[in-house]
């Protein structure tokens, strides 16, 4: 499922401010008159503006939107100036480069933002971001494959949907609360076993073994169109919302005693545990909940319709 976030909450409040003095001092006349030349020297090509690096005597650069645009363009000549920033007191708190024409994030070496959105850019290499203290990072629809540069970051939200990421090992021990990995070629999720994830999206991932989720304090998990067959690792957890539509799951028995309030599943695939599903304290139940639509109903409507369909199918 493609997220439609507004860079909560840090990037959702981007304020474009203009700081600093644009006034220029008049140039003083030269102390010595220039010597005459025989012929006019050919015009020299102006070099690209140098990046705004801190001077040795300075503790840090006082950033403005203008200097940030210059810094980004220095490393990305094709940059179109579309970035948005949240800058407070000369410090870049958050920036959104969603859809921008950038391939190089070396500009990140001189700033310490808490939230960054690089979604829908051709970015592939995150090494210049190594050691940053990001809390939110959005990489959806990028070419990023290797997450090792973000190892050790205090990330709470990470969105990887539709990237070629296969390995989540770099996320081990992160304080992640939300992980969106829709459409990634991920088969092994053991790297998140010790993360305090509450919201997890794995739609269209080829993952089959979800044993790692037994130790994760999930509130909501989407396993839509995965290869998951066995729900036993979820048994006894505090999970409230579960989406297992279009999966090879056939047995709902492991859900017994759980406090689920929403269940999305494929009834035609279920051969055991329907009675367990009927005993759950569900508020919503359905067979579809994705970008294409949803058909959630209260149990009082869903189960009579389900029973009628089963009875009709049983008639010769």
Regions found by a protein language model. Name each.
Residues 1-7:
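Bacterial N-terminal signal peptides that target proteins for export
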Residues 52-79:
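Surface-exposed cap/linker segments adjacent to membranes
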Residues 7-13:
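Sec-dependent N-terminal signal peptides
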Residues 20-39, 45:
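Short, low-complexity, disordered segments immediately C-terminal to signal peptides
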Residues 74-103, 112-124, 128, 132-145, ...:
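Concave beta-strand-loop units of leucine-rich repeat
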Residues 15-18:
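C-terminal motif of bacterial Sec signal peptides marking the signal peptidase cleavage site
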């Amino acid at each position: 499922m493609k997220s439609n976030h507004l860079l909560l909450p840090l990037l959702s409040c981007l304020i474009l401010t203009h700081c600093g003095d644009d006034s220029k001092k008049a140039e003083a006349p030269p102390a010595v008159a220039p010597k005459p030349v025989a012929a006019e020297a050919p015009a020299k090509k102006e070099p690209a503006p140098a990046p705004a690096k801190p001077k040795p005597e300075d503790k840090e650069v006082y950033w403005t939107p203008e200097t940030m645009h210059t810094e980004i363009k220095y490393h990305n000549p094709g940059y179109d100036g579309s970035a948005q920033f949240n800058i407070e007191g000369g410090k870049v708190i958050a920036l959104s480069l969603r859809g921008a024409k950038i391939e190089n994030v070396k500009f990140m070496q001189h700033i310490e933002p808490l939230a960054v959105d690089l979604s829908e850019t051709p970015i592939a290499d995150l090494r210049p971001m190594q050691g940053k203290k990001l809390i939110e990072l959005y990489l959806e629809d990028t070419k990023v494959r290797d997450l090792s540069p973000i190892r050790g970051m205090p990330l709470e939200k990470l969105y990887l949907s539709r990237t070629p990421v296969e390995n989540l090992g770099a996320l081990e021990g992160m304080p992640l609360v939300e992980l969106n990995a829709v459409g990634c070629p991920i088969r092994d999720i053991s790297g998140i076993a010790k993360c305090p994830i509450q919201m997890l999206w794995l739609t269209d991932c080829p993952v089959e073994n979800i044993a790692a989720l037994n130790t994760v304090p999930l509130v909501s998990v989407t396993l839509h169109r995965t290869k998951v067959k066995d729900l036993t690792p979820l048994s006894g957890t505090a999970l409230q919302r579960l989406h297992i539509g279009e999966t090879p799951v056939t047995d709902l028995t492991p859900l017994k005693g759980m406090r689920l309030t929403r269940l999305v599943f494929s009834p035609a695939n279920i051969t055991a545990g329907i009675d367990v599903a009927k005993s759950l304290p569900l508020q919503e139940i359905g067979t579809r909940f994705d970008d294409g639509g949803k058909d959630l109903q209260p149990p009082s409507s869903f189960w009579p319709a389900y029973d009628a369909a089963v009875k009709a199918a049983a008639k010769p």
